[in-house]
Amino acid sequence: LFTGCTNERLEDELDFRKIGINSMQSGDYEGAVAAFNSALSQCVGKITDTELDICYYKAAAQYAGGDIEGALATYQAMIDYDEENGNAYYLHGCLSLKQQDTDTAKKDFANAVKYNPDDYELYVGIYENLAGNNMTEEGEEYLNKAFDIKGNSAENLTWRGRIYYLLGQYDNAVKELEGAVKKDSAKANLYLAQVYEAEEDSANAEKYYQAYVDSGTADSVAMNALAEIQMEKGNYEAALEDIRQGLAMDNVTNQQELLSNQIIAYEYSGDFSSAWDVVQQYVSLYPDDEAAQREYIFLK
């Protein structure tokens, strides 16, 4: 898999890399893998970050195309090349877990934090993967290990606050996150909103969701959460505006939830014509949603 790349062939390598990325974006994962292999075949000599980057893309394309074994092999090749590549261990562990190979996953996760001991995101990612596979206690062990990371920067406080939130220790979460907000962490507003939402304090949840939106860094998930709070209060026009902002974002990760709430908000505001327009779009995108099919029949 690895040999390296000379300067003379770097341009061809980067061209094939670009072709692979474009193929991934269009859903042609087989073509993407072929392009990434062509990029790597240009390599002779010393390995650089470019080759490693291409391998990450290749593994992602293999996974997206349903070739989990191929993706595992690619990550393993990266580990064989650099036995201290914590990120490759983590990703190999995630896929091993999907294959129900929990023993390998646990070893991979242990190596991931061994070589990247100061990466909060890594600990949280491991927790989420383990908890999603009915191993919450094992996941919480990683969350608690993350407290060994020292520091009182805005980033440290934000991550610690989020971890306390995941552990259900809301008082500690608020303390850390309020400290992060004072140090101008926009993300801390989002996590504070989630803490207050978990405590069913909708007033404070709305306050911090709005602060997150006002920071200019909000994502579509935050816009949907803010819309749901507005809907609970009967402010359907405000909810619709939040939903429109969420759908207009560059990276919309929760389109289905946003469209579903948009239909409901239009209905409750009495705008059945707009609700009908959205439900037609929704049913075409998510034909297996039985509730949406019933809504389609109702509005029709």
Residue ranges: model-predicted function:
Residues 39, 77-78, 111-112, 145-146, ...:
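Canonical positions in the second alpha-helix
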Residues 42, 46, 81, 115, ...:
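Structural marker of alpha-solenoid helical repeat scaffolds
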Residues 13, 47-48, 52-53, 86-87, ...:
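Helix-start (N-cap) detector for alpha-helical repeat units in TPR-like alpha-solenoids
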Residues 50-53, 57, 91, 125-128, ...:
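Canonical tetratricopeptide repeat
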Residues 25, 64, 98-99, 129-133, ...:
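Register position in tetratricopeptide repeats
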Residues 4-60, 64, 73, 80:
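N-terminal leader/linker segments that initiate helical-solenoid repeat arrays
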